[in-house]
Amino acid sequence: MSELCPCGSILNYHECCGPYILGTQVAAKPAILMRSRYCAYVEKNVDYLIATWHPDCHAQEWRESIIQGFTKTVWHGLTVIADTPGRHPDEAFVEFIARFTDADNAQITAMHERSRFLRIKEHWYYIDGIRPSLGRNDTCLCGSGKKHKKCCGR
């Protein structure tokens, strides 16, 4: 039986993000790495997340914190908004919205980020991200249809 990939593509997991997480393929584009990292969060695969963080981040130091985060979070979906080049060929940005539920709050919440990726020797790595500002009167990203100030922005 085939299983759709959690990243939101219409592909089977083993034809989409699975090969990247298993290490049999290398993500050729930052958006692919972004999607596979989302799947790693869904699967609670700390090793893949650490391996795809830029070496300057020293992500291995956060291993326990990442694992603790897994116990509190259920992921509900990913929407990639934009995939844009950076200032040089080895930099790129991926803007996305990821929906999740935290154990401390039963309501679906959304995380909106513009992630920055750097390439080292044909491998892309996540280095950091910024959260674009959302006005209180904007529609909430979680998909509720409510204004941000009446929903996740409280």
Swiss-Prot record:
Segments crossing the lipid bilayer: none
InterPro entries (UniProt xref): NTF2-like_dom_sf, SEC_C_motif, UPF0225, YchJ-like_M
Family to which the UniProt record says this protein belongs: Belongs to the UPF0225 family.
PANTHER family in alphabetical order: ADENYLATE CYCLASE-ASSOCIATED CAP C-TERMINAL DOMAIN-CONTAINING PROTEIN, UPF0225 PROTEIN SCO1677
Name this polypeptide is given: UPF0225 protein YpsIP31758_1970
Organism lineage string: Bacteria, Pseudomonadati, Pseudomonadota, Gammaproteobacteria, Enterobacterales
